[in-house]
Amino acid sequence: MLGTGKRGLTAAAAVMMSALLSSPGSAADKKVFYLLSHGGPSDAFWIDWNAGATKACDQLGVTCKISFSGGDMAAQKEAFNSALAAKPDGIATTSAQPGLWTKEVAAAKSAGIPIVFFNTDDPATGRQAYVGADLKEAGAIWARYFVDHKMVKKGDKVFLPVEVPGASYQQLETEGIASVFDPLGVKYDVVDAGTDPAGIISKMTDYVVANHPPAVIALGDSVAASIKRVFDGAGVKAGSVPVVGWGNSKDTAEEVKSGYVNAAAWQFPSAQGFMPVALLSLAASGEPIGYDIHTFSLYDASSVGPILNLYNKK
């Protein structure tokens, strides 16, 4: 339900208000932040994230250099090192692979550059703060939803489609799922659906037709947004196969409303864009930022209304 995100957003609101009370500097002393995403600029989640980040940059009077690597880790690594060379006032980045930023974070800290992670985390790097969901807990919440609602049983094999197998989000979410399913003897199958929209639908449809999975956990937003088209193509009626997973798109929100998806997770994408900038602004002003802001809540047909209203305003 939407209420599960209240605590994290309360902390986030406090950060935002504190940051907004700081008056922007002149053009000559404007702070410069780099924001680096592993996502693609045309992805629905990242469009909303970018809107939030851009709003924060404007409201806080800072210069933000935003880049998207489209899943190319080498390109993101190059962008991070270019940011380090520019000696900015702060860097915010995703961490799509464990250990990807160990050296870079150490170099940034040595240079006195604040580092905030968002969307995907790697606390072992020593980053100063994180904005986003606890992905391992997200996986556990999805699995517990099925168990609590008696939608899976021992011996079932749950379909886990994902865009990028091996990425940190897949690994962490699957760890959370395993913590619930393994003791109960519920099996699961992580399947590479790819990132191409047409390919996702084709691969998922083929799997559903061939395997008749008893339940589905969509580990990413693109696979979650494809559920209706996959089920329609495979001849699966809405509600006959339980589905949970991510819900950061209008498509998935509509799937929840129409019964194709039982419950979906919302990461408050615009807030996830705004808050890293606010945290970097605080750090650049000398304020300590050693805390995380969790942006996550589960919604279903009874609570999807506000999310659909938000999308319909755009």
Regions found by a protein language model. Name each.
Residues D58-S69, K157-L160, A178-A198:
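Short beta-strand elements in bilobed, periplasmic/extracellular small-molecule ligand-binding domains
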